[in-house]
Amino acid sequence: MEKILVLDFGGQYNQLIARRVRDLQVYAEILPYTVPLEQIKANNYKGIIFTGGPNSVFDPASPHYTPEILELGVPILGICYGCQLICHMAGGEVKTAPSSEYGKITFKHAPSPLFEEVPELSTVWMSHTDYIATPPAGFAITGKTLDCPVAAMDNKDKKIYAVQFHPEVTHSEFGKQMLANFLFRVCGCQGDWVIDNFIEQKIQELRQSIGSQNVILGLSGGVDSSVAAGLLSRAVGKQLTCVFVDHGLMRKNEGDEVEKTFTQLFDMNFIRVNCADRFMKALKGVTDPEEKRKIIGTEFFEVFWDTIREQRDKGFFAQGTIYPDCIESGKGDADVIKTHHNRVNTPGDVQFAGILEPLCDLFKDEVRAVGEKLGIPKALVWRQPFPGPGLGVRIIGEITAEKIAVLQDADWVLRDEMAKNGYEKELAQFFCVLPNVSTVGVMGDHRTYDHLIAIRAVTTDDFMTADWAKIPFDILSQVSNRITNECAHINRVVYDITTKPPATVEWE
């Protein structure tokens, strides 16, 4: 399989670069700038992309790489900081710009393989404070902007290309074409990264790895674990046992839908552990959000591992780890920046033959594509992000069975209306929150004092920042009318119009 290396120098768009490359049917993987040169040589990459980054090449502490990489004979594309780094390593001159360039800029290019089928003038996205004053020997200037005399350069003999802007973002209107030119015209890629091929190859790999042993998977009903279950089921059938812990904090009917899907559509052993009463008892009287999260997490893993301990011939332990989890769990100088929820540490007293992560090469959109190919219902494949503690962090204050029922009903109405109006895939996330607030209302001739429901809906590319969704008023009105008429004990609906930051997407 053809592979492109995305060499990470700390850029915020490193995953986006890899995704854009994969969108063009070429496999890309991200490695930190600390990866040894010998490892890069051994992988026979078709090309290398240097990412951007927030640093300056003048700073001795900034990310650098050995100049020998420029002599490998492997095509290289430098983006933003990566562009300046190539210049710096090859002996050119980089200076601090008298004025920074940020945002959409008009770019003019000269003939270059990188700019085939790109208009001479186009809009690109700039974000830099340093600039190239003098390109290295052997490099030609191939692009400029009003304030940046060297916005692109190349050394055709060495197949090294560099751009000061970000072709991977949608604001660069012909960025996709530029990346395609690098992959197919410069690197000579054929485009063999196809989801159908991945499924076929992964099933064969799993069968070889597992052999006649069993596999246990913790199934949450989320996208990642559901697709992992589907793939493992296709590979080994009844050798797979899925454990689904139902803590009673799922959305309405969700536990039943998960059980129905995996018992009817797939060949596997399915264990559903209903333990809502246990969770309600543990959460009684608790109002602090962090304490609620801690209790739910602790109880969940105790139930899960107690169930696992009861299984004979455990074999392998499978997880729904996806590619961003791998990047986030071990980034930069091999430092762990966070332990991701999709990577679970197993207790010392539970022994497995090994850990399986069948989706660890895939981004979320690729996971969804695999799920659809496997025949998993779209309602599960396109399920929105759902916190591990479930509705427990969408009920402000103490969690009770009555509050769960109220929130489930309201949330079901919201999801139904969003689906009817085509917003299921349009919005990054939407849900209801039950604040610890009661309000006065009038229903019929009677005064009421019932719950308030808050609706939260956001648009975002990466969840690092988010904007509130501009849902039309007539749709919001219909949602409000249905919730107050169809759901018991609710007399008021409000809409959260706060961005992230200053707010987070979830309320707790």
Regions found by a protein language model. Give the residues of each.
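RNA-binding accessory domains that recognize and position tRNA/RNA substrates
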Residues: 1-50, 54-72, 88-315, 330-508
